């Protein structure tokens, strides 16, 4: 089942808050309440940045490529034992001013996903792992390779949104959700050949993170 993709310049999920803030901005402009006009103007610009939804394409035409699902900076690359299987763990931090749209890492199928609704504590808090809002998705490529992706919010008033269904087919770079600020972890097969390193800047739907062996 294919879900209608959000391809507008500004994400549809941002239309309501943007409209409300724009109305208040115009009202305070007409009433010459300059302080409130400035506050609403700044908030309007911030929301435009957060909900921007650019088109992304990759020039890499390789069936084994794994693209980043999120914009941000690579924090670390390490090995981790998941369900008695050693996997590569790639941690990416995305800030509030990074593009918030989440994109499929390759063409394939969503094996499944789950969302834990919660709070949005700082990631350095020891309680964040158990209390913060989190989404975990499993993707399977057309060649049968599988990866896990975990998204967790970080000091954000915006909820994580996932627009996917189990067994849904997705094309490479297809939008599947929204994360305004947080941490994303990609769990890749241990045999995957990495194309990035800690400190690398990545762009969702464009940057190649690794290649399936």
Language-model segment annotations:
Residues 1-213:
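Contiguous, well-folded functional domains in the mature portion of proteins
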